[in-house]
């Protein structure tokens, strides 16, 4: 009698496990690869900035990393660097790259200007008025607005790949902000401390509609220039913001 009950319990557990597995969805937020930007411009949402040769290698590395994953949906920011990073992933899974405007880079008043350490836009007094409130921030798109649109993009990707996995290619700041929100950290932060290297994956696991875990991987970290890696110290004349 006891043995029979145990077998029944096992069967019920297996059914529950199978049902639960079907309702597990993973959404990978991928930061694009390195961009060709020899002038060191903070390009932001400006069109015309494409992946460098190294950036294309990073994109290929991401595709290799995800080749055996159950990817059924690939979507990207409308900016060229994001589309070009998404393309190898989509190709390896026989998919098209969809576009979601909500994955776009954060707006920034310094777009089009150089923004290095010890030089560039911050040395000009006319720009100091934009630096009055780091909590909003005063120089760009409010953090809370980034959270709203990025959560919307994540939820849409989850629904499109329900029970499978989705890839969303976006940009450093919005990826970091939405991760900070999900992990219940404050949204204002030191940009040098963002854990969001070029061609990295920030992966959100959903059970049903609820995020139950967040993971982070760097499949192309060996290709990333040292000054652009997470936690690296800034170098004069170079900015981590260039690859945002």
Feature annotation, model-predicted:
Residues 2-24, 98, 105-117, 164, ...:
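Acidic, low-complexity terminal tails and accessory targeting/binding regions
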Residues 27, 164-172:
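Generic beta-sheet signal
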Residues 35, 174-175:
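Short active-site segment of divalent metal-dependent hydrolases/proteases
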Residues 68-70, 157-164:
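Glycine-rich phosphate-binding loop signature in dinucleotide/nucleotide-binding domains
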Residues 91-152, 215-216, 225-229, 234:
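Phosphate-handling substructures
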């Amino acid at each position: 009698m006891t043995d029979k009950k145990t077998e029944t319990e096992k069967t019920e557990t297996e059914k529950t496990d199978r049902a639960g597995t079907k309702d597990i969805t993973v959404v990978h937020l991928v930061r694009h690869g390195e961009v060709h930007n020899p002038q060191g411009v903070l390009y932001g949402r400006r069109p015309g900035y494409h992946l460098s040769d190294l950036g294309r290698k990073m994109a290929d590395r991401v595709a290799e990393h995800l080749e055996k994953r159950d990817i059924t949906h690939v979507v990207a920011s409308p900016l060229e660097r994001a589309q070009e990073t998404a393309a190898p992933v989509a190709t390896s899974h026989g998919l098209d790259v969809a576009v979601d405007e909500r994955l776009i880079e954060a707006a920034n008043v310094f777009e089009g200007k150089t923004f290095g350490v010890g030089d560039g836009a911050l040395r000009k007094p006319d720009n100091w008025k934009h630096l009055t409130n780091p909590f909003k921030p005063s120089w760009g798109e409010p953090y809370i607005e980034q959270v709203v649109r990025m959560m919307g993009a994540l939820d849409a990707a989850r629904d499109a790949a329900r029970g499978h996995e989705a890839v969303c290619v976006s940009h450093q700041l919005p990826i970091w902000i939405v991760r900070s929100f999900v992990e219940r950290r404050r949204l204002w932060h030191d940009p040098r401390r963002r854990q969001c290297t070029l061609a990295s994956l920030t992966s959100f696991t959903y059970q049903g509609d609820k995020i139950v875990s967040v993971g982070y991987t760097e499949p192309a970290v060996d290709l990333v220039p040292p000054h652009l890696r997470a936690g690296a110290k800034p170098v004069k004349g170079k900015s981590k913001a260039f690859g945002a």
